[in-house]
Design a protein with these regions (language model features):
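Hydrophobic alpha-helical segments typical of transmembrane helices
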Residues: 14-17, 37, 92, 118-119, ...
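Catalytic core of membrane glycerolipid acyltransferases/transacylases, capturing the structured
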Residues: 75-135, 161-166
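Non-catalytic C-terminal accessory region of glycerolipid acyltransferases
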Residues: 29-30, 35, 71-75, 98, ...
Length: 253
């Protein structure tokens, strides 16, 4: 992946995205981030083949903020988990379900029609059984899951055509307002979650403190403010280890 990655079509998108993140003149830093990104991408791809082993043995995964997770389980009330495509992001939902969270995850199918069935099978079998396909039907399905006491997990770091243009690393990026909409409508906490890969390819999942939402937040302005806050959290997560985020998406299109 380190050799092939720079040759693919999205390399220009990656460079443009990194220009927004660190500026157009720091070429050495850009190359370092790209090298780490492709290396992590390759490792994550290989790890898909071993998701069953990760499911059976989580000794390589630690959780920071487990008390927050235990409190969520104890309260037995749905929450909205939000994150991005960091390190091996699939392991976050896997660990949430392993710990006893009733969870449904919103996903975007891969553009590769040959690879997508395999990925969906692996996710349903070893990561999280309840998968919701992104889209209008997926929103309705999410509401049904919430009414059945399921928490919802979704990635909010990618561009969504139906989103709002909101600040993200100094530019304006189409951003999903779905977490804010669901949280304010059903009075649910929003819980950011992050995963880091260390040099030994062990992982630490961090459960952030819940963001409390009240009924006074259920208007359009407050939903936008809440979404901007979530964007800032994603920015902070990316900045912790830029090489472990996927820079190939045209986030600012």
């Amino acid at each position: 992946f380190n050799k092939i990655g720079p040759l693919i079509k999205s390399n220009q998108i990656i460079n443009d995205n990194l220009d927004k993140f660190i500026g157009p003149y720091n070429e050495n830093k850009k190359e370092e981030i790209k090298f780490k990104m492709w290396k992590n991408f390759g490792k994550t791809f290989v790890e898909y083949l071993f998701l069953k082993k990760f499911r059976e043995n989580n000794s390589h995964i630690k959780i920071k903020g487990e008390n927050t997770l235990l409190k969520i389980i104890d309260e037995n009330k749905p929450v909205i988990f939000v994150s991005g495509h960091f390190a091996n992001f699939e392991l976050m939902s896997m660990e949430l379900t392993r710990k006893g969270i009733k969870l449904a995850t919103i996903y975007r199918p891969l553009n590769n029609y040959f690879l997508n069935p395999f990925m969906e099978h692996m996710r349903r079998t070893y990561v999280c059984r309840d998968q919701i396909k992104k889209g209008l039907a997926g929103v309705r399905e999410s509401i049904n899951y919430i009414k059945n006491n399921f928490s919802i997990a979704l990635m909010i770091d990618q561009r969504v055509s139906e989103g709002k243009r909101l600040p993200f690393f100094g530019g304006m990026a189409l951003t999903s307002t779905l977490p804010a909409q669901l949280a304010t409508k059903y009075q649910l906490d929003i819980v950011p979650i992050y995963i880091a890969r260390d040099k030994n390819d062990d992982f630490e999942i961090e459960i952030y403190e819940p963001i409390k939402v009240s009924d006074v937040d259920n208007n359009e302005i407050n939903k936008i403010d809440l979404t901007i806050k979530l964007n800032k959290i994603i920015e902070q997560m990316i900045s912790r280890e830029p090489g472990h985020w996927i820079w190939t998406h045209n986030r600012w299109k």
